[in-house]
Amino acid sequence: GLFDAIGNLLGGLGL
């Protein structure tokens, strides 16, 4: 989902 993608991006940024 949308939030899943956001979480994935945040995880990639190290946040």
Swiss-Prot record:
Keywords: Amidation, Amphibian defense peptide, Secreted. Disulfide bonds: none annotated. One of its GO terms (biological process) is defense response. GO terms for cellular component: extracellular region. It is found in: Secreted. The modification Leucine amide is found at residue 15. It comes from the Eukaryota. Caeridins show neither neuropeptide activity nor antibiotic activity. This is Caeridin-3. It comes from Ranoidea gilleni (Centralian tree frog). The lineage of its organism: Eukaryota, Metazoa, Chordata, Craniata, Vertebrata.
